[in-house]
């Protein structure tokens, strides 16, 4: 498909599933400014659109790393979910980040496994998994963070511990 900013913007404004999917595919990166990204992410109302827009558009943005952290810090379910999904995709593409950024990402993701939102929890677990898959050092780092959760009575910590355990046994 040929990229087309005006068409993508018009499609996004339609409250129709297929229009939003196509908008994410047609939007040129060069004209998709951070302010527009924030408007789009605020209009995401379901997990399918969140996943597809992160895959087709958000992960390719030059400002995606900073924007994903900004979204992760948001309280709204789908904004936070998009932040984690975008970060997970960036980890699959690049995987490298500063120690400070990786520490912040892990802190936020570990906190998010306690979220009441199923989608936020799953996206947080995904970003932790992708972080671990990047290197043995990352996997070891996460293992150290969750080793005390083996006997936790908190559901989120149990899910995280079991996911990390599965990931390290593969």
Q: Regions from the language model: what does each represent?
A:
Residues 1-170:
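Alpha-helical scaffold domains
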């Amino acid at each position: 498909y040929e990229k087309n900013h005006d068409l993508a913007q018009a499609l996004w404004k339609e409250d129709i599933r297929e229009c939003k999917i196509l908008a994410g595919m047609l939007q040129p990166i060069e004209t998709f400014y951070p302010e527009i990204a924030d408007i789009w992410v605020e209009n995401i109302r379901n997990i399918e659109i969140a996943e597809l827009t992160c895959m087709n558009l958000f992960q390719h943005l030059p400002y995606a790393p900073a924007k994903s952290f900004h979204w992760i810090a948001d309280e709204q379910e789908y904004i936070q979910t998009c932040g984690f999904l975008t970060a997970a995709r960036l980890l699959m593409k690049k995987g490298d980040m500063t120690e400070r950024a990786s520490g912040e990402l892990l802190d936020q993701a570990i906190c998010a496994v306690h979220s009441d939102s199923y989608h936020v929890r799953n996206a947080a677990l995904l970003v932790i998994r992708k972080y671990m898959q990047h290197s043995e050092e990352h996997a070891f780092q996460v293992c150290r963070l969750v080793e005390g959760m083996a006997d936790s009575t908190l559901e989120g910590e149990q899910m995280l511990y079991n996911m990390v355990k599965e990931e390290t046994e593969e």
